[in-house]
Amino acid sequence: IRQADIVIDYKVNQKEILQILEKLCNSSIYAYKNQICEGFITVKGGHRVGITGTAVIENERIINLKYITSLNFRIAREVLNCSNKILGQIIDKESNSIYTTLIVSPPGMGKTTMLRDTIRRISNGIPEINFKGKTCGVVDERGEIAAMYQGIPQNDVGIRTDVVENISKAKGMKMLIRSMAPEVIACDEIGSKEDVEAIRR
């Protein structure tokens, strides 16, 4: 809940946190180890649970999290057609193509929600403006766009969309270009020099 704090008179202990985590991981925390090392897991429905604790480092990489201290539940929701207002700005109707587009806003304002719906509309096509659907490739590095669960997108990202997740943007873009020949590539959270270089290529 972004706009209000709800405080209850109950102190959760570490044993209870681990029990909750085990249930979220279907009693197989090991199967979710890679996601846990990234600080979150994605569960069925596309909901995301942030995890904090003590990082175990090896060769400058996080190989585990121990002493889990907090869980932060982010309830996923789709807002269909929220991209309607911007589609006219990013579509070249004459050539039936997409302009290079960057969505920018402060945290928590709906960038990912807007991006997801934009991908869906571009992928499906928009008959009302005679826009034919495009093959889309999504690099879902943190699993927030398509919210894949056991290989199945939990969010509607369109009928012509291929998704690769849990991979860096640079590697994911190369993979999609080499194997899927997308007409449009989308990704979320451009935050590093490597991300910028991958896009510029």
Question: For the regions a protein language model found, what residue spans apply to each?
Answer:
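Conserved RecA-like P-loop NTPase ATPase core
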Residues: I51, D140, I185
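P-loop NTP-binding catalytic core
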Residues: I29-S97
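Conserved P-loop NTPase nucleotide-binding/switch module
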Residues: M180-R201
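P-loop NTPase switch/communication element
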Residues: S123-K174
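Glycine-rich phosphate-binding P-loop
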Residues: I98-R120
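N-terminal accessory targeting/assembly segments
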Residues: I1-G45
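Conserved nucleotide-binding/hydrolysis micro-motifs of P-loop NTPases
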Residues: R48, V56-I57, E78-L80, Y99-T101, ...
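Residue-level preference for the first positions of well-ordered beta-strands
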Residues: T100-L102, C136, V184
